[in-house]
Amino acid sequence: MKWERKDILGMKDLSVEEIHMILDTAESFLEVSARDIKKVPTLRGKTIINFFVEASTRTRTSFEIAGKRLSADTINISASASSLVKGETLADTARNLEAMNPDVIVIRHSCAGAPHMLAGLVRQSIINAGDGAHEHPSQALLDMMTIRNRKGGLSGLNVTIVGDIAHSRVARSNIYGLNKMGVCVTVAGPATMIPRDIQQLGVKVCFSLEEAILDADVIMMLRIQTEREQQNIFPSLREYSTFYCLNRENIKKAKKDVLVMHPGPVNRGVEISPEIADGVHSVILEQVTNGVAVRMALLYLLTGASS
């Protein structure tokens, strides 16, 4: 299969074949990251702009490392260091970046749809690194890679996503992607954190953590996104953790070889207890490692290096 897509905007857009191609390509880059000299000349002469209008640690650093390991020139721009603070529109900023002739623009923005707007404005490839509560495709891809490597495949597995589903772009991207790969997805959380129409995406809904993780092969815990909430949707963090914190007792309801995942940042003692986050079931740090390989694969494919 030849890669033909210009942008990575969401898991909803990707075909099963494209997902397989990304994950297979990422596997080859895992070996690069394990070397003493973690650099290959694949993207020498290419320029990657990481334009993060919304705060990020893992994703921005991961994209920067991915570009540098492929020998690309990487430039990081934050909202506070851009002309957005002077009143320039996002569209004008994008056109100015386009005029500098980079090869890929990676964007994170608090507004859903911002990457899609840029993709229609500029000729460069756009990677959505998270847009509001909409999508976060590279996170879903690294999650799928982690599951596939640990379980030997994806089809037929039971994956439960627990937490603030309503405000989570990670949940939405994983639902789109996992459904396409034949995974049975269950979402769980308080009723105030579950969108009313979520079942239309092909998921099962539970309001009990214990019920949701019965027979689960993978449990994906999400933090409460207080920065996106317009009002209090639960009485207190203590009450939330009483019912929805994954701990050594309730995890016994899941399969013995269950994987525990978290996109980070982790709020220990709220959605997940420390002994589970650091325990034998946890693959949280493996997700981070795989994230670099997945983002290397995306940059490699979008710049045409594969051809």
UniProtKB/Swiss-Prot annotation:
Cited Gene3D superfamilies: Aspartate/ornithine carbamoyltransferase
Pfam families, alphabetized: OTCace, OTCace_N
Pathway, per record: Pyrimidine metabolism; UMP biosynthesis via de novo pathway; (S)-dihydroorotate from bicarbonate: step 2/3
GO molecular function annotation: amino acid binding; aspartate carbamoyltransferase activity
A GO biological-process term: amino acid metabolic process
One GO cellular component, as annotated: cytosol
Gene name, Swiss-Prot/TrEMBL: pyrB
Species lineage: Bacteria, Pseudomonadati, Thermodesulfobacteriota, Syntrophia, Syntrophales
Primary role: Catalyzes the condensation of carbamoyl phosphate and aspartate to form carbamoyl aspartate and inorganic phosphate, the committed step in the de novo pyrimidine nucleotide biosynthesis pathway.
Keywords, sorted A to Z: Pyrimidine biosynthesis, Transferase
Family the UniProt entry places it in: Belongs to the aspartate/ornithine carbamoyltransferase superfamily. ATCase family.
Organism of provenance: Syntrophus aciditrophicus (strain SB)
Binding residues for carbamoyl phosphate: R58, T59, R108, H136, Q139, G264, P265
Amino-acid positions noted as binding L-aspartate in the UniProt annotation, renumbered to this chain: K86, R169, R223
Alphabetical list of InterPro entries matching this protein: Asp/Orn_carbamoyltranf_P-bd, Asp/Orn_carbamoylTrfase, Asp/Orn_carbamoylTrfase_sf, Asp_carbamoyltransf, Asp_carbamoyltransf_Asp/Orn-bd
Signal peptide region: none
Assembly description: Heterododecamer (2C3:3R2) of six catalytic PyrB chains organized as two trimers (C3), and six regulatory PyrI chains organized as three dimers (R2).
EC number: 2.1.3.2
Reactions performed catalytically: carbamoyl phosphate + L-aspartate = N-carbamoyl-L-aspartate + phosphate + H(+)
The name this protein goes by in its record: Aspartate carbamoyltransferase catalytic subunit
